[in-house]
Amino acid sequence: MPALVLLGAQWGDEGKGKATDLLGGSVDYVVRYQGGNNAGHTVVVGDQKYALHLLPSGILTPECTPVIGNGVVVDPSVLFSELNGLNERGVDTSKLLISGNAHIITPYNVTVDKVTERFLGKRKIGTTGRGIGPTYADKINRVGIRIQDLYDESILTQKVEAALDGKNQLLTKVFNRRAIEAGQVVEELLTYADRLKPYVADTVLVLNKALDDDKVVLFEGGQGTLLDIDHGTYPFVTSSNPTAGGACTGSGVGPTKISRVIGILKAYTTRVGAGPFPTELLDEDGEALRRIGGERGVTTGRDRRCGWFDAVIARYATRVNGLTDFFLTKLDVLTGWEQIPVCVAYEIDGKRVEELPYSQTDFHHAKPIYENLPGWSEDITKAKTFEDLPKNAQAYVRALEEMSGAPISAIGVGPGRDETIEINSFI
């Protein structure tokens, strides 16, 4: 059975947790392939709400095996905090698998992240301060610590000492901080080894064997397309590849085994942190979207910046991911607006531009060109089929579908697990 990829088609926070959870009952494995605990997703099951940061959403589905792939960076303290929280609420987490090749977020990675952002001041990127970027930097610089290193104290010590050589120079001579003792770091990391061991596996082998055995594997991206280190609004991006290509490198599953790529689109647009955002609303409409949509970051606790739907970035997401379908979320939030503007193109230096500009400078100068679509006032949270939606809501969905370049196969009409309209089956 071929694999599916599910990813954010905007700047993250699109509702991937809801979408993954919806599919969880139909898949055998759910795989996180990049990012770390900088990605937050909320899943509502019955009257229970679960806020996950590192664990795959599939951990809430008993029949599913959740997997943390080699492309993820893992903070063991956060991992065990999430596992403990789920265990206390009666969730069985014993099926979790973690790649031994996944890199560990060390205490010094977190320290470097925080002091760097503080040092940059107004020029800061707006990271979550959780050590994600420095951990990926260590990975690329080949001084990273992998989970498998916890089981060879000699290698672990050598790697920590090598990594701290440069970092202590930075901390003491640039940031006026104390040097970090390698021995203390090694001691702390070794405390996680025994508890991690039951979860550690050769996940590349596990996933490929599962696909050979006709199991259904769902790859779950964190963040969103416009936060991709290569294809996002650089430098205001994350440090990994949430786009579809990252599913392959972050899991060890080849591209020919992926048959469907599903993009999650919010019915409007949000962004957390710094960076360009052409449709951002700094008025009462933006505040209303934030309030009605509950737009506060699961991981950061920061208010999200809100704006109207941007079809230009949706088309871009379709292109760079090879999207086959969209899952549209939070359509219910738009109930009550008489007119709903949709950005169909940009104006840049007096010219109409219908595709995402290649130039960072041009994108910073982009002004949205809107088309107004009629709104609706009816409550849509009880809708079970597309035809149950008000005519104007149907027209809004079809307009977004046409502008974005891929069919909308499911629609979220509320936060609950059952508040979803499935138009076309994903599996």
Curated annotation (Swiss-Prot):
SUPFAM superfamilies: P-loop containing nucleoside triphosphate hydrolases
Residues that hold GTP according to the record: 12-18, 40-42, 304, 330-332, 412-414
Keywords: Cytoplasm, GTP-binding, Ligase, Magnesium, Metal-binding, Nucleotide-binding, Purine biosynthesis
InterPro entries: Adenylosuccin_syn_GTP-bd (IPR018220), Adenylosuccin_syn_Lys_AS (IPR033128), Adenylosuccinate_synth_dom1 (IPR042109), Adenylosuccinate_synth_dom2 (IPR042110), Adenylosuccinate_synth_dom3 (IPR042111), Adenylosuccinate_synthetase (IPR001114), P-loop_NTPase (IPR027417)
HAMAP family assigned: Adenylosucc_synth
Similarity section: Belongs to the adenylosuccinate synthetase family.
Assembly, per entry: Homodimer.
GO cellular component annotations of the record: cytoplasm
Biological processes annotated in GO: 'de novo' AMP biosynthetic process; IMP metabolic process
Top EC class for this record: ligase
Assigned EC number: 6.3.4.4
Name under which the protein is recorded: Adenylosuccinate synthetase
Function: Plays an important role in the de novo pathway of purine nucleotide biosynthesis. Catalyzes the first committed step in the biosynthesis of AMP from IMP.
Any one Pfam family match given in the protein's UniProt record, by short name: Adenylsucc_synt
Subcellular location: Cytoplasm
UniProt xrefs under SMART domains: Adenylsucc_synt (SM00788)
Cofactor(s) required, per the database record: Mg(2+)
Gene transcribed to yield this protein: purA
Main location: cytoplasm
Binding site for Mg(2+): D13, G40
CC cofactor note: Binds 1 Mg(2+) ion per subunit.
